[in-house]
Regions:
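Conserved alpha-helical positions within TPR/SEL1-like repeat arrays
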Residues: 40, 44-47, 71-79, 103-104
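Alpha-helix N-cap/helix-start positions at coil->helix boundaries
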Residues: 3, 21, 36-37, 67-68, ...
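Long alpha-helical HEAT/HEAT-like repeat alpha-solenoid scaffolds in very large eukaryotic proteins
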Residues: 96-118, 129-136, 201-214
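Conserved hydrophobic register position within alpha-solenoid helical repeats
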Residues: 6-9, 42, 73, 105, ...
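Structural signature of alpha-helical solenoid repeat scaffolds
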Residues: 11-14, 47, 78, 110, ...
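Long, ordered, amphipathic alpha-helical scaffolds
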Residues: 148, 168, 172-218
């Protein structure tokens, strides 16, 4: 299969009717492709398969040598709330050396922890311990995402503070998080923060993110 056919196959994986056992066999082969981009796309597409081996494939990809592949695998594992996945993500939060991959591990860990109905107060303390350690801005942002998922009241306000980051990638992520995490009661605060950020925002990608997530603010 040449690269064009591989990419077409991976695009088709986002069609529910396409995600059969036969096609999972092809996906599993692409997850071992020599091209890390293909492996990463396979990890991202795997989330759409209900095949019993999907989880095992993603756990394997969390050990890939390429950061992007690991990041996509961590991201896709968010839909598997089970002890094995929770332990994998916990290990990644502590041991993952690349910030992008570590951030995705934190995001999925929070979702899996909530899905498992674990002791959220103990989980929140784990996150606060991580906040006391040196880490980059993207990891700090995702730690606040985790705390918000775990029920910490002021976490959404802390996330809004990242709208002032000098890094537009961080600002884009903050916009998406504010949308995802703001329920009906907290939506007005999120929208107010977005409108304030709009007064000084010039980056097209951030403006596009705001238009997507908060169309009423534009």
């Amino acid at each position: 299969m040449d690269e064009e056919h591989k990419l077409n196959f991976l695009d088709n994986c986002y069609d529910d009717d396409f995600c059969t056992g036969e096609h999972f066999t092809v996906l599993r082969a692409l997850a071992r492709d020599a091209d890390p981009y293909i492996r990463a796309e396979a990890a991202a597409a795997a989330v759409n398969f209900t095949h019993p081996d999907t989880k095992a494939l993603l756990l394997l990809l969390t050990r890939d040598e390429e950061e992007l592949v690991r990041a996509e695998a961590y991201d896709s594992l968010s839909v598997f709330p089970c002890d094995e996945v929770a332990q994998c993500l916990t290990n990644a939060m502590e041991e993952e050396w690349e910030p992008l991959a570590r951030s995705y591990a934190i995001l999925s860990w929070a979702d899996v922890t909530v899905g498992l109905c674990r002791d959220l107060s103990a989980a929140a303390e784990t996150v606060r311990d991580m906040q006391r350690q040196p880490c980059g801005e993207h990891v700090r942002l995702t730690l606040w995402y985790a705390l918000c998922r775990l029920g910490q009241e002021d976490a959404l306000t802390q996330i809004a503070g990242f709208l002032c980051s000098r890094d537009y990638h961080i600002r884009c992520a903050a916009v998406a998080f504010l949308d995802a995490l703001s329920d009906e009661a907290r939506r007005p605060m999120a929208e107010k923060s977005i409108r304030e950020a709009l007064a000084q925002e010039t980056a097209k990608s951030v403006l596009s993110a705001i238009e997507t997530h908060f169309p009423g603010a534009m």
